[in-house]
A protein has these predicted regions:
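An extended, acidic, His-containing surface patch that forms the Zn2+-binding/catalytic region
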Residues: 125-178
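Structural signal for hydrophobic packing residues in well-ordered secondary-structure cores
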Residues: 49-60, 111-119, 147-151, 175
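A conserved active-site cap/scaffold subdomain adjacent to cofactor or substrate pockets
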Residues: 79-104
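Histidine/acidic-residue-rich, glycine-tolerant segments that coordinate divalent metal ions
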Residues: 1-83, 165-166
Length: 178
């Protein structure tokens, strides 16, 4: 929160770009008493999850504002049955388009490779794709100056980046936004 009598403003990038994705892994279900007759998509999903976590740790600069989250991992309906499918849903977020492009390319390499290694089929679906929210510096300055005319004691506080995303980004790509 900003101190009373101030306005929070960001000169350029405000909210991260984000891509939501879903990975569906298809194996061969069966009874837990005969795992050798099955192809376990949960096992594949665990390996996909671990491989994707390594992207942030080993392929993104330590100072980059980048996040990859698997927030949902669903499979099966009984404790003694190996399911036929497993589904992982997640998001990638970054303030750098090159980093985001790298993560997307690696997602598309890693998931099929891991799936093949564990004899499952993989499908990747993009659920959402939201660009970075970019504020227009000139418009920001105009707004601050206009507000200071109304309230001379107003202080402009520069905000830090927020890893959240917002579809307002599409508007800020078309017209100057603040």
């Amino acid at each position: 929160p900003a101190p009373t009598g101030s306005i929070i403003i960001n000169d350029t990038d405000t909210l991260a770009g984000s891509m939501g994705f879903e990975v569906t892994l298809e194996g061969q279900g069966g009874h837990g008493s005969r795992p050798e007759k099955c192809i376990d998509p949960i096992n594949t999903g665990v390996h996909v999850y671990l491989a994707l976590q390594e992207l942030i740790a080993r392929e993104c600069p330590a100072i980059s504002e980048t996040a990859l989250t698997i927030g949902q991992f669903c499979a099966g309906s009984a404790s003694n049955v190996i399911p036929e499918t497993a589904v992982l849903q997640g998001t990638m977020r970054s303030f750098d388009e090159k980093t985001m492009a790298h993560l997307i390319a690696r997602l598309n390499e890693i998931v099929p490779s891991v799936a093949e290694a564990y004899r499952t089929k993989a499908e990747i679906e993009v659920i959402s794709d939201v660009p970075i929210v970019r504020c227009n510096e000139e418009l920001n300055q105009e707004i601050v100056e206009g507000l200071k005319e109304l309230e001379p004691e107003l202080k402009a506080v520069c905000a830090y980046h927020v890893m959240g995303s917002e579809d307002f980004a599409y508007i800020s790509q078309k017209i100057p936004a603040s």
